[in-house]
């Protein structure tokens, strides 16, 4: 979740510089029903971060021009313009607007990019932007859509799931299973090292229940104990999809 503003009070100048003033996130957990954050609604995850931004920056929220939130599955608890729902849930000023956008896995990044572009253009001065996805409560694919749910469209458009696409690219470019397993292992080691050394503690906001008890304080789904042998024993994630003809 980012707080983005500029150093100009002029409206619609040729060019402003957009600054990331602050950035926070929740700890990450497993996106399944047995994940640590399963009991927490998406709007509560978001509201906790919004309140943290407000408190640590002594922010008068009436100065916030807009809130932009990326969300891949904007349905159910994540539907109905979740950006505005989080604003209201956090108790921010009623004048603060909100918009939700979807660019699949790049939704949160697109939200930040859009906020930066609006600030740089002079359209807005202060925006909160980020992404939200609570996959333990709103699983991937919950929102349906033509690509996965309309066979005629999927065949006509040549739809290929992301995992199959990644496997295909790896094959074309000559990456072996051992190559990508080694990359994954190094990623897990670096994530564990960063967490254990507290490198991102200032940005990670603990998640609390309605009584103020901490549910999750640090990322708990990093596989620090992974080994090449262990990874090598896992089945290919998209093997069955490949058998179906993708």
Where are these regions (language model features)?
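N-terminal extracellular/periplasmic Venus flytrap/periplasmic-binding protein-like
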Residues: 15, 24-27, 38-48, 56-58, ...
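Flexible glycine-/small-residue-enriched beta->alpha junction loops
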Residues: 120-173
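Conserved active-site "lid/cap" helical segment
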Residues: 12-90, 97, 105, 168-177, ...
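Active-site-proximal alpha-helical scaffold in enzymes
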Residues: 101-132, 170-200
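Short, Lys/Arg-enriched N-terminal segments with co-localized hydrophobic residues
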Residues: 1-13
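Conserved catalytic cysteine-centered active-site region
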Residues: 71-125, 156-164, 228, 232-246
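Short glycine/serine/threonine-rich phosphate/pyrophosphate-binding segments
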Residues: 29-30, 79, 109-114, 133-139
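Structural alpha/beta core scaffold segments of enzyme domains
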Residues: 3, 60-61, 65, 120-121, ...
């Amino acid at each position: 979740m980012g707080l983005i503003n500029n150093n100009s009070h002029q409206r619609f100048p040729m060019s402003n510089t957009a600054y990331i003033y602050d950035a926070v996130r929740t700890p990450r957990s497993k996106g399944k029903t047995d994940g640590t954050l399963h009991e927490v609604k998406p709007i509560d995850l978001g509201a906790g971060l919004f309140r943290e931004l407000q408190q640590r920056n002594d922010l008068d929220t009436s100065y916030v021009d807009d809130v932009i939130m990326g969300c891949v599955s904007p349905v159910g608890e994540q539907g109905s313009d979740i950006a505005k729902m989080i604003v209201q849930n956090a108790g921010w000023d009623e004048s603060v607007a909100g918009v939700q956008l979807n660019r699949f896995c790049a939704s949160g990044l697109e939200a930040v990019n859009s906020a930066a572009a609006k600030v740089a253009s002079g359209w807005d001065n202060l925006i909160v932007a980020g992404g939200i996805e609570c996959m333990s409560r709103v699983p991937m694919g919950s929102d349906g859509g033509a690509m996965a749910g309309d066979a005629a469209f999927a065949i006509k458009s040549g739809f290929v799931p992301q995992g199959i696409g990644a496997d295909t690219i790896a094959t074309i470019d000559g990456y072996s299973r051992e190559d990508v397993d080694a990359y994954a292992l190094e990623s897990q080691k670096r994530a564990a090292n960063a967490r254990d050394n507290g490198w991102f503690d200032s940005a990670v906001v603990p998640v609390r229940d309605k009584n103020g008890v901490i549910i999750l304080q640090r990322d708990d789904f990093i596989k620090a104990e992974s080994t090449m042998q262990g990874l090598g024993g896992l089945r290919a994630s998209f093997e069955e999809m490949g058998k179906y003809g993708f």
